[in-house]
Amino acid sequence: MWIADGWKDYEVIDSSKGEKLERWGNYTLVRPDPQVIWDTPKTHKSWKKMNGHYHRSKKGGGEWEFFDLPEQWQIHYKDLTFNLKPFSFKHTGLFPEQATNWDWFSEKIRNAGRPIKVLNLFAYTGGATLAAASAGASVTHVDASKGMVTWAKENAVSSGLKDAPIRWLVDDCVKFVEREIRRGNHYDAIIMDPPSYGRGPKGEIWKIEDAIHPLIKLCTQILSDDPLFFLINSYTTGLAPSVLTYMLATELKKFNGVVD
């Protein structure tokens, strides 16, 4: 198990009764987490001094309740700076646990000894994009949401990476990869963090159980002859790690790599 223990601006303070108490920089948030099944006493003082509380609705969704919380603030991870702002579905614009992935591939990029081209699909607010760019890679950042790409650009500016070699694209990820195949473009590394369900900018429907394997197959056609890595992150509970391992091992066999 990898643990994101390099944070100074983020920590899980406590958890109980389906909720997590977290510190994001100078502010404390309470958010629901279905994996917190224990019913321990909420004795930590920060439970009573929270700055934001996301209440899940029985009908689905939910809403935020704020207490002296700014609309936006920043936290830092090593050389990177992220702009946070709570929005729908309990999100803040960052998944701190992803820092383990950032550290892993950043070391690979730095030690590659050659220029590395990275494709980041379903790239969200750009955590992986900025980590890869900071490590020295040129990055193509693709997400279907214009708002998320704008947010990622803001994070790049805040991180001092405004002029880094990053291409920002609002596009359907599958259609983009298909076009890259036709163009003959190749990448040394691919990162993807696909949602369980989503829609492209023109209403394209994405369901991970149906679409992830075909996408992996497509991506093998845009990998360079000596790829550095292929990283998939998924929070979909119905998609077991063993299934993803099988897909990657099957489709990437010709590259003679190791699947972890």
Named regions from a protein language model:
Residues W38-D39, H44, G203-D260:
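C-terminal substrate-binding/active-site "lid" region of AdoMet-derived donor-dependent transferases
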Residues T125-A137:
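Conserved SAM-binding loop of SAM-dependent methyltransferases across substrates and taxa
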Residues P115-Y124:
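Conserved class I S-adenosyl-L-methionine
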Residues D5-E22, L29-P96, D103:
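Non-catalytic substrate-recognition/targeting regions of SAM-dependent transferases
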Residues P96-R114:
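Conserved alpha-helix/loop element of class I SAM-dependent methyltransferases that forms part
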